[in-house]
Amino acid sequence: TNNICQGLLKAQLPGRFQVLPGKPRIILDVAHNLSAIHILSTSLSGMADHQKTYGVFSALKDKDIDGVVQAITSEIDVWLVAGINSSRGASSDEIVEALESVGASKANGSILVFPDPVAAYVFAYKQSTINDRICVFGSFYVVGKVMEYLEQEKYG
């Protein structure tokens, strides 16, 4: 993960509201604190029409998960909670609890839990239509893993 973080920092800040070409619209943002999440939420709300937004999300334990979720919940229709394979990662249960506190629910399908960011992203991509968008956010780890996957898919 340290190599991923270093690579992201060196390369013109990819992962900061990085919108990939094509449909569905894919947004990568390493936003992981309240200030950055407010900017991400504002940027998402200013985007052109879309039907559904899938949020591939996870966070580290030391982040304000409740505040982050509260700040962006109006922009996310389906939360795809992705596990972080690190002792610093928040548990899926902690994230689900924060999401349930703002009205999302496993029962109604607005929260789905995955073992890792790539599994969450692949699910979102397969479920989405060309009119939807997928926002991958919450940490350098989550965005980095999805970026690695996309590079492998692109270049084999």
Spans of model-derived segments:
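Nucleotide phosphate-binding/pyrophosphate-handling subdomain across enzymes
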Residues: 1-78
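C-terminal helical cap/extension that packs against the catalytic core
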Residues: 25-27, 34, 69-133
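Short glycine-/acidic-enriched loop or helix-start segments at secondary-structure transitions
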Residues: 37-38, 65-67, 91-92, 145-148
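Short helix-capping segments at alpha-helix termini
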Residues: 47-49, 102-107, 154-155
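Glycine/aspartate-rich loop-and-adjacent alpha/beta segment that forms the canonical ThDP
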Residues: 140-156
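Residue-level signal for short, function-critical loop segments
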Residues: 59-61, 83-85, 140
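A general structural signal for well-ordered alpha-helical segments in protein cores
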Residues: 14, 37, 53, 92-95, ...
